[in-house]
């Protein structure tokens, strides 16, 4: 089994997250914690659309996984007082799949497409007239007898979510009237989310314990909530049910999540470069062998947080571990 599947600190959604996260999700912008810039802009755009009795412009939400793009899409629908239909780029394999989704929409509905960057170009071309003119061009028949039929669609709002905005084609990206980047959360914002989640779970939690979980959550609510679930288990089995600072520190130590939110895979990657390659520079392919992961997995999954906190650098010559990482491990920085 791949390491990434079992990783507690993965920003990607897992089945257990989907099951338990639904009641945790805020329903309105007022309830939504963080993303103040995107939230305040959306408040204005939504209110203006409602005052004009129009559908909201199409919205593109982009940024790292686990930061609330799906939640924002559902909030947009709630604030507009309409239904939301959810699908994803990989789920729309043929133009006919998209046509079926579009023709089932009711006036004003929100269509949420997650991982929209993974739409095939032929499907994007079907989407263009739907976004611009609320119509669908369908080709009936084949060969010389083929003809195009235009179907009118009800006005709708497309909300697309992507972790790779640069992977969207320019024609698709240009058809979104609202572009909002979601940012990593501060420790205080994550602490508030942890306390709100504990309230939903009906679990008592100390404010210091909430802060400790927040500090180790990599700026990501999904990870914060996942850590709280596991700490809650320790509180129930090893304590009296209350999530205290003592229980939290013990649980996170046993889960191998250190004070900066690094886990055993991060340690293995960094220490591998330090001990085997004197801190680098070293090529990505060479790094991948010792930890048993493919190079693209390291680049897309493990490296972003290490780059974010300044423990790793990407250079033309390869990866280099920074002095901050040496300091974190209590190791002496090698002399050049």
UniProtKB/Swiss-Prot annotation:
DNA binds at residues 314, 319. Mg(2+) binds at residue 70. Its EC number is 3.6.4.-. Residues 1-185 are annotated as: Large ATPase domain (RuvB-L). Residues 186-256 are annotated as: Small ATPAse domain (RuvB-S). GO terms for molecular function: ATP binding; ATP hydrolysis activity; four-way junction DNA binding; four-way junction helicase activity. Residues 259-336 are annotated as: Head domain (RuvB-H). Keywords: ATP-binding, Cytoplasm, DNA damage, DNA recombination, DNA repair, DNA-binding, Hydrolase, Nucleotide-binding. The keyword Repressor does not apply. It is found in: Cytoplasm. GO terms for biological process: DNA recombination; DNA repair. SUPFAM superfamilies: P-loop containing nucleoside triphosphate hydrolases, Winged helix' DNA-binding domain. ATP binds at residues 24-25, 66, 69-71, 132-134, 175, 185, 222. InterPro entries: AAA+_ATPase, AAA_lid_4, DNA_helicase_Holl-junc_RuvB, P-loop_NTPase, RuvB-like_N, RuvB_C, WH-like_DNA-bd_sf, WH_DNA-bd_sf. Pfam families: AAA_lid_4, RuvB_C, RuvB_N. GO terms for cellular component: cytoplasm; Holliday junction resolvase complex. The keyword Aminoacyl-tRNA synthetase does not apply. It comes from the Bacteria. It catalyses: ATP + H2O = ADP + phosphate + H(+). HAMAP family: DNA_HJ_migration_RuvB. Homohexamer. Forms an RuvA(8)-RuvB(12)-Holliday junction (HJ) complex. HJ DNA is sandwiched between 2 RuvA tetramers; dsDNA enters through RuvA and exits via RuvB. An RuvB hexamer assembles on each DNA strand where it exits the tetramer. Each RuvB hexamer is contacted by two RuvA subunits (via domain III) on 2 adjacent RuvB subunits; this complex drives branch migration. In the full resolvosome a probable DNA-RuvA(4)-RuvB(12)-RuvC(2) complex forms which resolves the HJ. Has 3 domains, the large (RuvB-L) and small ATPase (RuvB-S) domains and the C-terminal head (RuvB-H) domain. The head domain binds DNA, while the ATPase domains jointly bind ATP, ADP or are empty depending on the state of the subunit in the translocation cycle. During a single DNA translocation step the structure of each domain remains the same, but their relative positions change. Belongs to the RuvB family. The RuvA-RuvB-RuvC complex processes Holliday junction (HJ) DNA during genetic recombination and DNA repair, while the RuvA-RuvB complex plays an important role in the rescue of blocked DNA replication forks via replication fork reversal (RFR). RuvA specifically binds to HJ cruciform DNA, conferring on it an open structure. The RuvB hexamer acts as an ATP-dependent pump, pulling dsDNA into and through the RuvAB complex. RuvB forms 2 homohexamers on either side of HJ DNA bound by 1 or 2 RuvA tetramers; 4 subunits per hexamer contact DNA at a time. This is Holliday junction branch migration complex subunit RuvB. It comes from Bacillus cereus (strain ATCC 14579 / DSM 31 / CCUG 7414 / JCM 2152 / NBRC 15305 / NCIMB 9373 / NCTC 2599 / NRRL B-3711). The lineage of its organism: Bacteria, Bacillati, Bacillota, Bacilli, Bacillales. The gene is ruvB.
